[in-house]
Amino acid sequence: MIILSKEQVILLHAQLIAETGGSEGVRDEELLESALYAPFQSFGDRDVYPSIQQKAARLGIGLTKNHAFVDGNKRIGAHTMLLYHPLI
């Protein structure tokens, strides 16, 4: 199971901004952490998002909707979601 760290996602975001333009930087670290941890929530003994597809989708949605970055939130959401693609 791939679990991206906050540092890895910040680095990926910086690379995306360098390649595609925009403003670099984290706007809210707590929202970033929330988006990164959401796919791995559980209730009792069950994962809320049990499949890799559901985890990837929840990660992409969280990064897109939380607006943790100054710019490029949709780009980083799509990019991190696609990192799971070879595993699906």
Identify the residue ranges that each predicted region occupies.
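FIC/Doc superfamily catalytic core
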Residues: 1-88
